[in-house]
Amino acid sequence: LRNEELYEPVCRFQSASSLTDEAARSRAQHDLKLIGMNKVGSIAADFIYTLPSGMQKRMRDICTPYTLLLFYNPDCHGCAETLATMKTSAVLNSPHIMKQVKILAFYPDEDREVWTKHQNEIPDGWINSYDKELTVLTEECYDLKAMPALYLLDKDKKVLLKDATVKEIEDYLKNKSL
């Protein structure tokens, strides 16, 4: 379930209910922790990303009015569909939007060979990166139970949209008249 507004009260009930078994209560408490991270309106968790060259940078150092985080796995069918939609999006690919929004495609998993094999699928204007230290997954900085995951951040790295669809991001950017 990807609608946190609906899921959060369910988790709160399960974690407090004496009718819930220990495994379900533990799962609900863990999910509550994930729901609480990177909420809309909060500052997004910073992380280090590694470029194909091996150079490492911090997400918070991206200096554009908007940052679009794409957490993905190149072998994931849903990720491939989202990537294709983004690459053909008239909104995301308009020259004016491209000046305002930096897209960070971030592979958080450990199989670097998979990421390397698919590098050419990421457009040149995007930041193509991976998590060399696997920090995002091991520290659970982001809720990545399901991928792809898209986050739209403002210039201060405040979360504007969390786990959004491409259409929601397009609509947001269009409504901001970028």
For the regions a language model picked out, list residue spans one by one.
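Structural microenvironment flanking redox-active thiols in thiol-disulfide oxidoreductases
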Residues: A80-N120, L134-E140
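Short active-site neighborhood of thiol/selenol oxidoreductases, capturing the structured segment around
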Residues: K57-M86, K102-L104
